[in-house]
Amino acid sequence: QYMDPKAARRMEPFCQYAVAATGEAIRNAGIDLEKEDLTRFGTCIGNGLGGVATIEKEHAKVMNGKANRVSVMMVPMMISNMAAGNVAIAYGLKGKCTDVVTACATGTNSIGEAYRYIQVGDADVMVAGGAESPICETNVSGFISMTALSSATEADRASIPFDKDRCGFVIGEGAGVVVLESLEHAQARGAKILAEVVGYGSTCDAFHITSPAEDGEGAARAMTLAINEAGITPADVDYINAHGTSTHHNDLYETRAIKKAFGEDAYNVNINSTKSMIGHLFGAVSYTHLTLPTIRL
């Protein structure tokens, strides 16, 4: 539906997901690409883990004495930027083409940076989001070693963010893409505007390679930056779609971050995490922080 079989064979699943999700987003937005200036139409689609499954497959050939049989497509299939690259190729998008790789924040950072590109006049329209296909032996083994995966034996207790009995996450796969455009561009084409991006904050804990800062200071500062840019107050926020990985440390430290950023208003805002329903999509998961609340508006 979104790509021919030959093109699909040259893509890791995360790239296939990105191309399909972008097609759905463009269709949902009612955009006619033939009427667009494609040099002003960009791509910012991130990926966190790359094509580890491809690396596994081709490395096995090397270890079995068949290095000369390694696929010529191994490198372009495994590198993270090919989610954005394949989307640009599939739809002829000739504006900015960037790949954000910031682990679980990838999707949100991609949308935020695309917002900035439009804000400063570098693009009129951007497709932005994240894509991931992490389910393979190496990735699963690594997360098991980190004790990050759920040990629950009952499915409805396997991914339970902020629950006192939480014990890790469940790996998911997929992609999510949104169309961002300047207000002027949207109005000129008579677009049905679903939501407006009015604030974006991005910070770093500079603390540890896997653990968030225990006091939540960095995450709190990111939320405060977004709130301030939007020109609102914490009391104006109705809902937070949290990272909520269902791990002990993340959910505890994220709760501290929300309380630090929102003060007493933290007790009045609705909070949940979509990982209880779709699992952890890593580089793709944080697009849900924008898209699912938008759908509910």
Could you tell me what each predicted segment is?
Residues 53-67, 117-120, 140-153, 214-215, ...:
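A glycine- and small-aliphatic-rich helix-loop capping segment at beta-alpha/alpha-beta transitions
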Residues 18-29, 83, 110, 182-183, ...:
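Short, well-ordered amphipathic alpha-helical segments that serve as non-catalytic structural scaffolds
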Residues 154-230, 238-239:
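Condensing-enzyme catalytic core mediating Claisen C-C bond formation in acyl metabolism
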Residues 226, 233-244, 250-277:
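A beta-strand-loop signature enriched in Asp, Gly, Thr, and Trp
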Residues 1-102, 131-140, 234-252:
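Conserved beta-ketoacyl condensing-enzyme motif
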Residues 207-216, 245-262, 281-287:
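Short glycine/threonine-rich loop-to-helix capping motif typified by GTGT followed
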Residues 288-294:
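Conserved small/polar residues in nucleotide/adenosyl-binding loops
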Residues 1-7, 17-24, 48, 86-89, ...:
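Conserved beta-strand-centric core segments of catalytic alpha/beta enzyme folds
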